[in-house]
Amino acid sequence: MAALRKRIAELEGRLASQEPAEREEHEEVTHNILDFPGDDHLPDWNDFNNMSLPTSNNTSVGDTETSFSNFIASTTAQSMPMTMASLTSTPVTTASLTTAALMPVVPLTPATTVSIATPQLHTLSGFIPAELDQLYFERVHPAIPLLHQRTYLSWSRKDIKKKSQLCLQHAMWTLAALQSAQYRYLQETLYRSCTQMLTSICLSDSGQDPFDTEQIQAWLLITVYELMRSFHRQAWMSVGRAFRLLQLLRYHELDNPALGIPAGQDFIEREEQRRAFWMAYVLDHLFGVSNNWPITLNELVVCTRLPAFEEDFQSERPVLGSFLSEAITEQTPRYLSAFNETIIFATLCGRRLFYGQQFHVRSAYGDMYSNWSNSTLMLDNILRQRVDILSQCYPPLDEASGPMMHFVSTMAQCSIIYSCTGADMMLRVDEGNAAMQTEYALRAATAAEHVIRLAQMLTRCFVFKVLSFSPPSFTTQHRHTSEKKYTLTRRQQIHPLASIPLMLCAEFLFKNQNVSEKFATLLERLLKEFEQIRDIEDPAQSYIDVMKRWQCSAKNSDRQQRQPSVDSAALSA
């Protein structure tokens, strides 16, 4: 033991007496390792006034993906200078192993640890942040009700914020800028700085950036932005980040009695977590139905209550919502919420999607004679009941109804179309179902006519102008039986996700236009309405252009390898 201590002391003496030139060489090598390729091309977010902003709306997210992939590849190559040849060129002996074992262990310091530098978020000054906040809560929040306004305004005024809060704020501003003619030029810069910061947080292994609700909210808003700009592939990647964070934080079982409520958590914080989960749930089902993908957030394992009534949420009244299974089967809803209705119709579409996928799997195993009638009829009965509740309990749809109410009405009709399509497919394997197939075709045609009327309402909507809201008045009598009542001063906006159910309807009509002349006529009428609906990406374009981009994206999915896609020439005819 004395010899070992003497040997350690000698080694420490050698380390302390290193030549200055060797230390300088080591520092230079460390500096070179930390100089990542591409740093010279990164924008300086702190010098925004002198920054040249992009002027084209056709910027491709794919370019960002390519450059990021090259960046990672080159970074990996430079951070691993040793090859197998260099490792094996020096013979390993017992003496060398003994010497290495006797050397003191020197822990890595931040100066010798290779890590990706955290990008700087773009900073806005003056009155622009306040204006973008106001634009967000006027134009985005009615359709994407994620945030508690008072809580956000409280922490947004603080000088020191969490990284995730900064990301959320910039995601909000990105969506607000997209829907503003005045600040539209800021959207690209805000979007890129926000996604870079979010990605850096996800890649951080230091533990200094714990995962939280604000990150999920930011990813969800970024997903909505990418969908509005028809970046469908990138939107799926972004929402996938939100899915993993939700699963990691177990937001699918926020109201599990066995887990309880964390100490110190208030109603508002818990409710924002619920809303983040359910918004991701809706997006998951929309992606799944649109592309025939498996559902990630399965309803069978969800133990989280539906969002509370919006007025209760904003007024901080701790009134809990129902569980999903209870709300779906309620004959009379406890309270009316367009957001909750959207969740329910998305769930029903997800069930039909699952039945169809299960049908194909069983067919592959030779189970061609399974009885699908019971599940089909049960789903049909629930769907009819929910459509009746929507028409009987909610006020008639008009221009003053708001984007969320219009969206859920479109979702309801598209749920009928999707359900009829799936049922017809499964009924073809059984004999004696011709009458039911005819009934499903008639129901789908009727629902398509409703969608056309709903699309016609969107032709009278502005892209940037929205409803000017007067403060809503509520009474105890109708607080839980009606949505907010606003005073209409301008025509309403289009829901950020409105194109998805409309495109599903158009796709159905296109694929069945040769089945019946009725479907061909409905397709022609719907496309005429699409020509009059303005695109938020480029107001000079219409939903015909949105549909072309939709089909261009769909051709890259596995589903389009088996089914025909819409011809662009036919759309523009």
UniProtKB/Swiss-Prot annotation:
Coiled-coil blocks: none
GO cellular component terms given for this protein: nucleus
Keyword DNA-binding: yes
Annotated protein name in UniProt: Ascochitine biosynthesis cluster transcriptional regulator
Source organism (scientific name): Didymella fabae (Leaf and pod spot disease fungus)
GO MF, one example: DNA binding
InterPro entries: TF_fung, Transcription_factor_dom_fun
Subcellular location(s) per record: Nucleus
Keywords, sorted A to Z: DNA-binding, Metal-binding, Nucleus, Transcription, Transcription regulation, Virulence, Zinc
Biological process (GO), any one: DNA-templated transcription
Purpose: Transcription factor that regulates the expression of the gene cluster that mediates the biosynthesis of the mycotoxin ascochitine, an o-quinone methide that plays a possible protective role against other microbial competitors in nature and is considered to be important for pathogenicity of legume-associated Didymella species.
PANTHER family named among the record's database cross-references: C6 FINGER DOMAIN TRANSCRIPTION FACTOR DBAA-RELATED, ZN(II)2CYS6 TRANSCRIPTION FACTOR (EUROFUNG)-RELATED
